Amino acid sequence: MKTYLPESTILGILKLIEVYEFYDQPCLFSCQNLSGQAYIALWVDSSEVEDVWLYAPVSLERFDNIKNGKVDLKTVFTHSEDAFVFEVSIPCDDHKQAIVKALACKDLTEDQLPETNQFIQNKILI
């Protein structure tokens, strides 16, 4: 299993769009499900047991604004258009299911978030 794209969850069948940061695997990327919902995903934690990600649903207009440097990454998560993001815990054990839960933007902690004024600059080809 790819440790950054959960399978069989309420997020749907996800396909990678672009990678913006990479460290052993994509750390910051965009993806989209088959019905067209786009997400900006950020790797926030890792352990021997699981990797934890934040997935912010974004409209296509907002996605363009993010890619064009009009919205910083912290704002993507703290002011999601629907006021929530998904926390996705993906187990390292391929036999276990990913756990997805909705989090209100106001409940995110600073250690889960990018620093202020960080923007997507370029996509990385992998």
Predicted features and spans:
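Amphipathic, interaction-prone secondary-structure segments
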Residues: 10-46
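Cysteine-dependent deubiquitinase/ubiquitin-like isopeptidase catalytic cores across multiple families
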Residues: 4-11, 15, 116
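Low-complexity intrinsically disordered segments
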Residues: 54-126
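Short, surface-exposed terminal/edge motifs of secreted or surface/virion proteins that either
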Residues: 37-64
